[in-house]
């Protein structure tokens, strides 16, 4: 299947006016959402064009390959595999080597059941694990994929569906 989005907000004049103005923020949001979806679905081919300029042309690959395609070749040698399987959750993915930590926090991704989510407590836990390994003010890279029984996670906490709530049982 192929999906193409053109003339976004064509029928919504107030949104169209926003786009016709300074659209750099919107472009950044579209790119960010594209990256999240592409990182969750490495087996899918994706292409992103903005104003007819090719931004991404992603071929099907594995998770590591997709991370390299999105973030850049520099990250390839800095990814450490993570794999934990319990009766409650399966955790897979990659964390960055401590020496590759950066001041910017643009390489931190959490996914649950194929969906990107944001969790301040989980982010703090991951950063705390690096506490003595990285300079203060730096952030480690991480790409963590959780698989949980769908009955144990609620994705309807926030309209953007980026906040999730996990069941305690």
Language-model segment annotations:
Residues 1-169:
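N-terminal phosphate-binding caps/lids of nucleotide- and nucleic-acid-binding domains
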């Amino acid at each position: 299947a192929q999906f193409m989005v053109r003339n976004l907000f064509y029928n919504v004049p107030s949104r169209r006016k926003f786009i016709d103005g300074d659209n750099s923020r919107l472009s950044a949001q579209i790119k960010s959402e594209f990256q999240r979806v592409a990182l969750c679905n490495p087996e899918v081919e994706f292409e992103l064009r903005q104003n007819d300029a090719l931004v991404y042309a992603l071929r099907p690959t594995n998770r590591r390959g997709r991370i390299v395609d999105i973030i850049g070749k520099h990250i390839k040698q800095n990814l450490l595999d993570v794999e934990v399987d319990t009766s409650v959750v399966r955790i897979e993915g990659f964390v960055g080597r401590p020496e590759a930590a950066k001041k910017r926090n643009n390489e931190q991704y959490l996914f649950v059941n194929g969906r990107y989510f944001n969790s301040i407590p989980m982010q703090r836990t991951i950063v705390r694990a690096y506490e003595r390994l990285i300079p203060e003010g730096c952030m480690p890279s991480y790409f963590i994929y959780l698989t949980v029984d769908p009955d144990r996670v609620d994705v309807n906490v926030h309209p953007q569906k980026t906040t999730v709530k996990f069941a305690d049982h």
